[in-house]
């Protein structure tokens, strides 16, 4: 066999396997939602992606890394050479183990850390455990999220409001605070925002508010740490096929079946389509001049309509 043939990369597989489009099977799950029970299974492998060692030698922490966007990001980070710690809830242990196997199949280390990000002490502990395992922390991805669809604001209870804010924005602030105690110049903090934080969502008042707060805090923190050589950015996805929506009690199985059909591209994103944006923002080779940015990956939706 010639060298030319041996060195030729494989053809991308995605063109032969189009991303799934609605309608999907009608389905519902209890919170927090389990990826292995979703039909169809979300795609996270990004088989057509070609890694280039952009994160070689880095240590990353990804909250909500057991499933959805977090899993896809954690696995792609590993493919780019990073060791990865992932945070998850007790009910998500099975999904977390699948993520661990996927990371270790890339020859990288994976640390599973179980706990509740609504608790301030755990936000400190998850960072401390990551540093103890890998000796450092170069990349923080604050990704775990909670949502409650409501027909009206009056339906939203104080308990639901507090859990959404504690999970989505308080945890981000606390994780960043803990991470900055050990991060050095060249490190990167990335948060998962949402189209709802830019355009709003009448059915997700508290969730949208937290995502808007994430955008504001990202821009503020970026200014705060720019002199330390640490970059802070966010990714704002449109609809993504993850367990988050089928596990929302306010989302009927019939709505899940049509999920993502109302965006211009006509379908929800697969997690593997979001992960490269996080690699881009984590990599100093790609985005050393980018900080304080909310990168929109929204399937054609724009703030201008």
Map each language-model feature to its residues.
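A conserved structural motif in NAD(P)-dependent oxidoreductases
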Residues: 263-274
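Active-site helix of classical SDR
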Residues: 176, 210, 218
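Alpha-helical segment proximal to the catalytic Tyr-Lys
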Residues: 181, 223-227
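Catalytic Tyr-X3-Lys loop
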Residues: 154-173, 190, 214, 265
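Residue(s) in the substrate-gating loop at a strand-loop-helix junction
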Residues: 194
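Short C-terminal tail/terminal secondary-structure segment
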Residues: 4-7, 38, 46-47, 150, ...
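Conserved mid-core segment of classical short-chain dehydrogenase/reductases
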Residues: 23, 119, 124, 132, ...
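A glycine/serine/threonine-rich, flexible loop-to-helix segment
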Residues: 204, 227, 239-263, 304-305
């Amino acid at each position: 066999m010639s060298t030319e043939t041996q060195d030729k990369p494989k053809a991308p597989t995605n063109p032969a396997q189009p991303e799934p489009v609605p309608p999907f099977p009608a389905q519902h799950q209890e919170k927090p939602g389990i990826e292995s029970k979703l039909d169809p299974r979300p795609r996270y492998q990004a088989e057509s992606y070609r890694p280039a060692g952009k994160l070689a030698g880095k240590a990353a922490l990804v909250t909500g890394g057991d499933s959805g966007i977090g899993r896809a990001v954690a696995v792609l980070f590993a493919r780019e050479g990073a060791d990865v710690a992932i945070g998850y809830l007790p009910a998500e242990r099975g999904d977390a183990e699948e993520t661990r196997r996927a990371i270790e199949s890339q020859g990288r280390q994976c640390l599973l850390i179980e706990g509740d990000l609504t608790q301030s002490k755990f936000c400190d502990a998850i960072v401390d455990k990551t540093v103890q395992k890998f000796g450092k922390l170069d990349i923080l991805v604050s990704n775990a999220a909670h949502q409650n669809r409501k027909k009206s604001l009056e339906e939203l209870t104080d308990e639901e409001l507090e859990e959404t804010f504690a999970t989505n924005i308080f945890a981000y602030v606390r994780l960043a605070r803990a991470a900055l105690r050990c991060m050095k110049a060249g490190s990167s903090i990335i948060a998962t925002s949402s189209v709802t934080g830019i355009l709003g969502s009448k059915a997700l008042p508290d969730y949208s508010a937290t995502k808007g707060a994430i955008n504001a805090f990202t821009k503020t923190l970026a200014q705060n740490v720019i002199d330390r050589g640490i970059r802070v950015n966010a990714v704002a996805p449109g609809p993504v096929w993850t367990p988050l929506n089928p596990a929302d009690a306010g989302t009927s199985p019939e709505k899940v079946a049509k999920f993502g059909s109302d965006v211009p591209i006509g379908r929800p994103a697969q997690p593997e389509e979001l992960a490269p944006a996080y690699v881009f923002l984590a990599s100093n080779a790609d985005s050393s001049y980018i900080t304080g940015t909310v990168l929109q990956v929204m399937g054609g939706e724009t703030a201008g309509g």
